[in-house]
Amino acid sequence: VELTAAKKVVVFDYGFGNVRSAERALARVGAEVEITRDYDAAMNADGLLVPGVGAFAACMRGLLDARGDWVIDRRLSGGRPVMGICVGMQILFSRGIEHGVEAEGLEEWPGTVGPLAADVVPHMGWNTVAAPADSELFAGLDADARFYFVHSYAVHDWTQETHNPLIAAPKVTWATHGKPFVAAVENGALWATQFHPEKSGDAGAQLLTNWIGTL
């Protein structure tokens, strides 16, 4: 049996993510993991994971201070995989509005992160998702697989249009809490989830395995 080298994943450490739980989850599925904000390490890794917890504006400030916006942009321009989790997904959209304060995001995708349209907020706990049939991220997972969410804000409208037939349209996965919201996106080298795969048990482990399999 030919042994393949473990994939190297950098968990980007900019002060606003559950970096240790992400590290443990990735290591459990066979990745070689480093927690760092070092530019060269983040650029050279097979995969870059950007976790995020807290307020949208604060996460963006932390990411900019760590030059994470540049790292993400440079990796994506070279087709190098990047994955965002929770607020690490939200900051990939155009902007976020929290408590009436608007902050700019990275604008990889059009859309506004706003308060969840639900009676019970935050959305905390396990929920199912509706993934496209051709999803790579959710490959091998049943439709009733459950993932762990904890958030008060989300993207309720996916507005990106792909008119170029040579460019594959992003694959968008939805979940519902009150109104439907974006639960995950697969867009070329850039994937992201609103839920926490590192806290989602076997389903989350399968999902991370699927991501690592693309690196």
Where are these regions (language model features)?
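Short, surface-exposed beta-strand/loop micro-motifs that present aromatic residues
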Residues: 174, 179-186
